[in-house]
């Protein structure tokens, strides 16, 4: 009986040791997992916070100078046709310097489009807090914008007013400029606000009737 008791005691002690080791291993695993998870999440947040600035820096590296183009000379015979007869360099989603989804929009991208000679500037317009803003989306839906931020319509038009018609910021500043708005909203208020902003920023640039 004493032998059986000793064997049973030894068995229980061994089980307790294994259980304790197992608990320690589980604890170590959980702590390591939490540390790794925090590190990965911190790295993700850091990269996302820098993404807006990175997009602008990347554009500066790619487009570091004016292209070899200039404004049209209306006296040249090749420039006497109708507007419809020309190909016009166009920038799609002109405030987007990265992806259309899970990214940022910035006026630095708009400035680069102007600097590179785009004379048709495209924008996707949304209504946020009853104000017209510029954003992007990868889906065709009035109610979904997929960027982390937005650019106010007023800021974008101010950039155009200050950059698109100056020889120091546009290589073809004397060429006609077309603005293409894809308005993703049924909010009538923003239409009036857009009209007021255009009148304020670009009234002296509008082609006469």
Residue ranges and their predicted role:
Residues 2-120, 126-209:
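Long, acidic (Asp/Glu-rich), low-complexity accessory segments flanking structured domains
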